[in-house]
Amino acid sequence: MSLEQRVTELESRLAFQDDTIQALNDVLVEQQRVVERLQLQMAAVLKRQEEMVGQFGSFEEDAPPPHY
């Protein structure tokens, strides 16, 4: 394999690696957006649950069993 062929092969591999890195970066950015949305949704659910516990009390409070 000549030096020119080796350089051409390396340039080709580099181009494919650049494309792969960009594709992986795009996926990572989208996943981060999804994680951020899920964190916001989870915070809202936790807040709502805390509000409901404040209004209705916890199910674990010393309530008598249902058969009483």
Curated annotation (Swiss-Prot):
Protein name, UniProt field = Protein SlyX homolog
Query: One matching Pfam family, short form?
Result: SlyX
Q: Which NCBIfam families does the record match to this protein?
A: PRK00295.1
UniProt signal peptide:
none
In terms of HAMAP family, this protein maps to: SlyX
Organism listed in the record = Pseudomonas fluorescens (strain Pf0-1)
State the gene name recorded for this protein.
Answer: slyX
Q: Which family does it belong to?
A: Belongs to the SlyX family.
